[in-house]
């Protein structure tokens, strides 16, 4: 027994193994190890004033994401897939820009692991998309995916998942269409709708029913703002969306989209 305990302590004290980042950028595919990225000629030590995931200032060794996206243009669409099934849909343009907000791929050093995101939770590593000056370009929390395993170039959400589209007869400036854009930015990374989407974390938001059908309006708003105030369990992962992230008019538009899609179930 004593030998088993000693072995367990030894294993727990060993550094994390090097991770692999997979890039699938159309005709170009590439794998980067964490060691290669930490030694990348453009790697820098950066400071994040208010980290979205850790809720405090953080310091990282990071590479400008744009230098890794060989062959990607501003009109392309990318998806960052996390180890837990989170799938962030992102237009490429903000990821390629060098300011005012700039995207960085933070790389966890296996010899100096980052802190856990919470009790019983892993860290944000091995790879984490962070931003300097995010407020300058309106970068939202869902654009900070962590535990990234793969970044890939795909067709747009509209082209891949027509079941998500609102009625084409709606005017271009309708609240429902604006709500669809907000759904893509804030919800699609965790939820599918009408079975459409790549996320594997949260429930489908229209099949078999829309939350607009089984929640009273005030409770649905409360769920979106502060999920833990309505229901709690140890594995809960849904974040709350404060007004600084999703304004009241934007929440109205998001709910307008969900109500509209309740009538467009397959």
Predicted regions and their residues:
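Positively charged n-region of N-terminal signal peptides that target proteins for export
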Residues: 1-4
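N-terminal signal peptide c-region/cleavage motif recognized by signal peptidases
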Residues: 13-15
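Structured, non-membrane catalytic/scaffold regions adjacent to prosthetic-group chemistry
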Residues: 19-155, 266
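Second-shell loop/turn segments in exported
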Residues: 49-56, 168-169, 208-210
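Electrostatic cytochrome c docking/interface patches
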Residues: 155-182
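The canonical Cys-X-X-Cys-His
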Residues: 179-194, 220, 238, 254-258
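Gly/Gly-Pro-rich "capping" loops immediately C-terminal to redox-active cysteine motifs
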Residues: 192-225
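Axial heme c-ligation environment in periplasmic c-type cytochrome domains
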Residues: 200-206, 226-255, 261, 265-266
